[in-house]
């Protein structure tokens, strides 16, 4: 969400991300908006668990929370808890194949304080999402597909995507 009323946004990204994989990652980004004199930003936490010599090689779970403005004196809070299960062939670690099962819950809530020219009242928006990905990222052959399902109080959605690329000699 971008808001021109905020003017210049000043922020800092504080995290423990590095070159090597860590079991626990965090990121905190407070953002101060000069014109509106507000503090927004986001927080992310993630926990990784790796398994050696198993087809299920990684489980990671975490949560991200974002608080931002979308109009003058109007803010939105987005919270996303998630868990991912990542698979690979434990007998051939050079095989560039990815299989992943992701589950997440997206919750969006808008806070209104008399927004000009906006007649809509947006209720909280909550969606449960499950996605399975299977892909092979080879030099000569590439294929990737996913099956995605989303469920809410008011709708359900099922989607499928398939990508293929072959390199000619």
Regions flagged by a language model, labelled:
Residues 7, 76, 153-157:
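Active-site-proximal structural scaffolding
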Residues 1-57, 84, 89-97, 104, ...:
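Outer-membrane beta-barrel initiation region
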Residues 60, 80, 100:
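A residue-level signal for beta-strand positions that form part of recognition/binding surfaces
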Residues 58-71, 84, 129-133, 140-169:
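C-terminal outer-membrane beta-barrel translocator/porin domains of Gram-negative envelope proteins
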Residues 78-84:
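Gram-negative (and chloroplast) outer-membrane scaffold detector with strong preference
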Residues 31-35, 50-52, 66-72, 90, ...:
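Sequence/structural signature of outer-membrane beta-barrel proteins
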Residues 37-41, 74, 157-161:
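A short acidic (Asp/Glu
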């Amino acid at each position: 969400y971008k808001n021109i009323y905020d003017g210049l946004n000043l922020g800092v990204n504080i995290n423990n991300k590095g070159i090597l994989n860590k079991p626990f990652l965090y990121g905190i980004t407070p953002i101060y908006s000069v014109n509106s004199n507000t503090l927004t930003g986001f927080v992310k936490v993630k926990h990784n668990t790796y398994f050696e010599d198993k087809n299920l090689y990684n489980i990671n779970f975490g949560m991200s929370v974002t608080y931002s403005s979308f109009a003058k004196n109007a803010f939105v809070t987005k919270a996303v808890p998630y868990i991912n299960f990542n698979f690979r062939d434990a007998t051939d670690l050079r095989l560039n194949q990815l299989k992943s099962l992701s589950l997440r819950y997206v919750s969006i809530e808008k806070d209104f304080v008399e927004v000009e020219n906006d007649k809509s009242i947006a209720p909280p928006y909550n969606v449960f999402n499950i996605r399975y990905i299977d892909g092979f990222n080879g030099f000569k052959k590439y294929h990737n597909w996913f099956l995605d399902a989303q469920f809410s109080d008011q709708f359900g959605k099922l989607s499928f995507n398939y990508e293929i690329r072959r390199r000619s000699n």
